[in-house]
Amino acid sequence: MTTLKNDRFLRALLREPVDTTPIWMMRQAGRYLPEYRETRSKAGDFLSLCKNTEFACEVTLQPLRRYDLDAAILFSDILTIPDALGLGLYFETGEGPKFHKTVRTEQDVANLPKLNAKADLDYVMNAVSTIRSALGGQVPLIGFSGSPWTLATYMVEGGSSKEFRFTKQMMYAQPEVLHALLDHLADSVIDYLNAQIDAGAQAIQIFDSWGGALAHREYVEFSLNYMNKIIAGLQREKDGRRIPVIVFTKGGGQWLEPMITTGADALGLDWTTPLNTARNVVSGRVALQGNLDPAVLYGSAASIEKAVKAMLDDAYANGEKTGYVANLGHGITQWVDPAQPKIFVDTVHEYSAKYLG
């Protein structure tokens, strides 16, 4: 196995000493990069890009050629699981992901097949192993999945939603049906993430993108409990190293205390939760990741530097010298000038030295 040349990302997640703050960016391989757009045009469409091992590897590596990032993340989509369960994923221009089938009844849930990730999502595993090999130990590779709650919203609604009408209707009128769906999805995610780890993923992130749409009790019952189940079912060591797990609930800053109980090594934050507040809440029990507003990257070099320095000041305000990974508070947007993320990345590495040196 190739020796990892830069492991500060993994070390920070495990609250071990680091020489500088590690950084990666959610959606770092994406439409803001001209080379990504060129590769996507060769693939023909987004799904073809995900399913072609060579293209998926290429776009995963593209941001690492531009920026001094401390981790790569698998290029894929959170909706690969529902697609493999037979719902028929497709994308409509300007409308995002959609499914040919929905899951809205007890019978719909009963009809879902058991996922065999290594067979049903072999293109993802091929991409993971190919990317891991291509990285050559440069930086660790992050694998990922959507949370059961987040996946369920797409499956019940039939695509993206702002109100989650049908999912919340199921939650309050037929909670047993939703629980059955979430349990099926939790088992699927466990299988999927363990297959990614076997293929070479060195850390895992669970994207609970829509957890913040829930009230507190419902968040615990319908989202958090199933992430607990997933983390308990994951391989936590491979090739003699721990596999760190990050849980990211967008809009979940008020739930840090219960989120610690998941067994995750780190919690992701969006930009609505001050890092110094979050540090005080978690009190060194888990690492934190985040949380620059992606819109900051629309600004000038000076304004980006100012915002990044303020974020780092907050992250290290309580005197802790590790347990922190810099990131955006959500995915980078397609309208960002590719020159701006370099300012973000370089400022993190340079400025954090005053705290970690």
UniProtKB/Swiss-Prot annotation:
GO-annotated molecular function: uroporphyrinogen decarboxylase activity
Alphabetical list of CDD domains matching this protein: URO-D
Keyword presence, Oxidoreductase: no
Transmembrane segments: none
Domain of life: Bacteria
Pfam families: URO-D (PF01208)
Catalytic activity, reaction form: uroporphyrinogen III + 4 H(+) = coproporphyrinogen III + 4 CO2
SS bond partners: none
Enzyme class per UniProt: lyase
NCBIfam families: hemE
Protein family per UniProt: Belongs to the uroporphyrinogen decarboxylase family.
UniProt-recorded name of the protein: Uroporphyrinogen decarboxylase
Source organism of the structure: Acinetobacter baumannii (strain SDF)
The gene coding this protein: hemE
